[in-house]
């Protein structure tokens, strides 16, 4: 059975030759070179992913939603009752939540995964539960390092199993009351930013309670002393099971040489962890949308990412990842279905990259 260390070691590098061939092909399509902008660079990025066999393509699509509760909810950092996590997870199995509707529109399957819901098991939800909620990061660690490592490996294997069954495009999502607090703590640690710069309103926290949330994040970091150079240490000390789960999806997809669409702020924190654990993950990550959560810009700047969509969204669940899946498919369609300049006897002069 593969260990986490072996999985990380075996993440392949992008295929530079395939990317060069893709760029040459795109430059010869029936358009001025570069005129389809980031759709072109996305197609080249996809071409370099070994799991796609050297060409931009999309097979089956899946959004993996990691569901868990958080002990830090007890600190008054969320307005919704904790039971809403379980209620919404059940709603996801019925296809009625935001991510389910958007995923259905994109032709993607939603996998609802319980990695730490504080309730009885829910029919139709994949059970990878570590515990009924993680620890309160304001008073101690979220979980042990061994728990984090075991969950990373389990989710990575689940992701790779889906890849073997034909999934070639993954999206990540989460569900958990109070989870923007540990996400903000992680972003603060990884970027070196003060908590006040990255703490937002989450699911409509009243402005009068923001200062308390900032204080909770600062206390969590001060008490746990996470090492910013050790992604697993940060996840286990100030993260949460849902954040670990999303990180595991990224590691697993990268191991299989396949793309992962990020969602919003929560997924940015997990991406920071994934890239710290294994920098080789970075070329497989695709930013979907620019989260409206306060710390989004700082997290994205640290990841050197510019999302494709600016929709003022902050729902989470993987909604942004699902919404961006058609953009990935559009990049593939451009690559395979457009005509070629040579076939139409069109010769463009040099310097037409910005033509419209």
From Swiss-Prot:
The active site is at residue 317. GO terms for biological process: cobalamin biosynthetic process. It catalyses: 5,6-dimethylbenzimidazole + nicotinate beta-D-ribonucleotide = alpha-ribazole 5'-phosphate + nicotinate + H(+). Signal peptide: none annotated. Keywords: Cobalamin biosynthesis, Glycosyltransferase, Transferase. InterPro entries: Nict_dMeBzImd_PRibTrfase, Nict_dMeBzImd_PRibTrfase_bact, Nict_dMeBzImd_PRibTrfase_N, Nict_dMeBzImd_PRibTrfase_sf. PANTHER family: NICOTINATE-NUCLEOTIDE--DIMETHYLBENZIMIDAZOLE PHOSPHORIBOSYLTRANSFERASE. Homodimer. Catalyzes the synthesis of alpha-ribazole-5'-phosphate from nicotinate mononucleotide (NAMN) and 5,6-dimethylbenzimidazole (DMB). This is Nicotinate-nucleotide--dimethylbenzimidazole phosphoribosyltransferase. It comes from Salmonella paratyphi C (strain RKS4594).
């Amino acid at each position: 059975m593969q260990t986490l260390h072996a999985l990380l070691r075996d993440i392949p590098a992008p295929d530079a030759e395939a990317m060069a061939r893709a760029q040459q092909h795109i430059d010869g399509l029936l358009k001025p070179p570069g005129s389809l902008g980031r759709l072109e660079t996305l197609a080249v990025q996809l071409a370099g992913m070994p799991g796609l066999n050297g060409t931009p393509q999309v097979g089956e699509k899946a959004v993996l939603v990691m569901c868990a509760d958080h002990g830090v909810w007890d600190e008054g950092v969320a307005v919704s009752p904790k039971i809403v996590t379980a209620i919404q997870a059940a709603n996801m199995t019925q296809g009625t939540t935001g991510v389910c509707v958007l995923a259905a529109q994109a032709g993607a399957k939603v996998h609802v995964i319980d990695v730490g819901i504080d309730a009885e098991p829910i029919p139709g939800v994949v059970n990878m539960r570590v515990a009924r909620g993680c620890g309160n990061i304001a008073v101690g660690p979220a979980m042990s390092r061994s728990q984090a490592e075991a969950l990373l490996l389990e989710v990575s294997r689940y992701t790779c199993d889906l890849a073997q069954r034909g999934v070639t495009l993954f999206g990540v999502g989460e569900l958990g009351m109070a989870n923007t607090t540990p996400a903000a703590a992680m972003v603060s640690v990884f970027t070196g930013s003060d908590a006040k710069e990255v703490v937002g309103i989450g699911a409509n926290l009243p402005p009068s309670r923001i200062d308390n949330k900032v204080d909770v994040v600062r206390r969590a970091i001060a008490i746990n002393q996470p090492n910013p150079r050790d992604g697993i240490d940060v996840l286990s000390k100030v993260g949460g099971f849902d954040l670990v789960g999303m990180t595991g999806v990224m590691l697993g997809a990268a191991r299989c040489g396949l793309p992962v669409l990020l969602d919003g702020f929560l997924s940015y924190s997990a991406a920071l962890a994934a890239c710290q654990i294994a920098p080789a993950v970075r070329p497989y990550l695709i930013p979907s949308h620019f989260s409206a959560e306060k710390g989004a810009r700082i997290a994205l700047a640290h990841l050197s990412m510019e999302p494709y969509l600016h929709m003022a969204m902050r729902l989470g669940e993987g909604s942004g990842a699902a919404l961006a899946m058609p953009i990935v498919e559009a990049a593939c369609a451009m690559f395979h279905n457009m005509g070629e300049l040579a076939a139409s006897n069109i010769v463009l002069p040099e310097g037409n990259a910005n033509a419209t």
